């Protein structure tokens, strides 16, 4: 590693601080890769996959299972329908626009559940490549940024009450950070509702990841004999949720682990960004963004329509 790689080291250390957000880390890695400042001898793919798994496990300590189940009894039906509907719609739209299957599935999972965290969890289960992960994350991050500003404006224009807006934000916005940001801008009650529902929605990472491993093992197998690779870290993720619920006296420790996991996820996104380049993105074209935007518009409008009709 020579002097020209010093920017890589500096950027990596910077991603360990709270000053760098997930989207910024992805862009930072991409810029370094595009300018040839990433050490070519580093096994980025190996490091990324391991760190992603550990990050997801750590995030499990931030989910309060009992509270999420109790508060979301009224909204769980809508959550299930939107998750299943989004995954099914994603399959159909991908066929129509002829988008590569793995990338389309990652974007669908991110839209259906919880953005980058869902993509990170599903990716190892379906053996996604770094470029596919990066395209899915980039698509979700662009839409997240738009949602942060658009949703409160629409909410005020339609005079949505606090609970309705909080529910809508939790259902239709990808990442927890954008859900919290949009809901907090709308009101305190909206923030409480949105945060709790979002955590309940995040629980679906577990069954969706396991189902994904099974589906892709069958669908992509050579002569039907490809070995099924289960994302075992998901079981540890589930164990983390259960442990934090059974032993609430260690709440301060859990919050610390959760914070470290979130920062580790930022580092993951930086490493993923380091594995792509302008040439790779150009080869993908505009299809991923068009695909993600289509899914997002459908889930946003249908969930809002349902909430307006039933409130």
UniProtKB/Swiss-Prot annotation:
Major subcellular site: membrane
Similarity comment: family membership: Belongs to the UPF0324 family.
Record key words, sorted: Cell membrane, Membrane, Transmembrane, Transmembrane helix
The keyword Membrane is assigned to this record: yes
PANTHER family: INNER MEMBRANE PROTEIN YEIH-RELATED, UPF0324 MEMBRANE PROTEIN FN0533
Subcellular location: Cell membrane
GO cellular component: plasma membrane
Coiled coil: none
Topology of the protein relative to the lipid bilayer: Multi-pass membrane protein
Lineage: Bacteria, Pseudomonadati, Pseudomonadota, Gammaproteobacteria, Vibrionales
Descriptive protein name: UPF0324 membrane protein VV1122
């Amino acid at each position: 590693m020579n002097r020209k790689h010093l920017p890589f080291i500096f950027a990596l250390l910077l991603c360990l601080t709270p000053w760098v957000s997930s989207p910024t880390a992805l862009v930072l890695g991409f810029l370094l890769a595009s300018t040839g400042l990433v050490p070519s001898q580093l096994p980025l793919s190996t490091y990324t996959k391991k760190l992603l798994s550990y990050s997801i496990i750590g995030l499990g300590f931030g989910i309060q299972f009992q509270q999420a189940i109790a508060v979301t009894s009224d909204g769980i039906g809508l959550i299930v329908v939107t998750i299943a509907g989004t995954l099914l719609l994603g399959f159909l739209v991908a066929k129509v626009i002829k988008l590569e299957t793995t990338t389309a599935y990652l974007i669908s999972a991110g839209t259906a559940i919880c953005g980058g965290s869902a993509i990170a969890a599903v990716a190892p289960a379906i053996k996604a490549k770094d470029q596919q992960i990066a395209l899915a994350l980039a698509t979700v991050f662009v839409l997240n940024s738009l949602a942060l500003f658009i949703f409160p404006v629409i909410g005020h224009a339609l005079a949505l009450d606090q609970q309705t807006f909080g529910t809508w934000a939790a259902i239709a916005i990808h990442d927890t950070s954008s859900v919290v940001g949009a809901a907090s801008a709308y009101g305190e009650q909206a923030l409480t509702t949105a945060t709790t529902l979002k955590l309940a929605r995040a629980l679906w990472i577990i069954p969706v990841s396991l189902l994904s491993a099974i589906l892709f093992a069958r669908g992509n197998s050579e002569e039907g004999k490809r070995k099924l690779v289960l994302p075992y870290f998901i079981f540890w993720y589930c164990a983390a949720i259960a442990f934090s619920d059974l032993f609430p006296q260690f709440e301060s420790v859990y919050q610390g682990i959760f914070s470290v996991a979130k920062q580790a996820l930022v580092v993951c996104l930086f490493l993923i960004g380091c594995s792509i380049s302008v040439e790779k993105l150009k080869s993908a074209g505009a299809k991923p963004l068009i695909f993600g935007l289509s899914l997002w518009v459908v889930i946003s409008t249908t969930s809002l329509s349902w909430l307006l009709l039933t409130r």
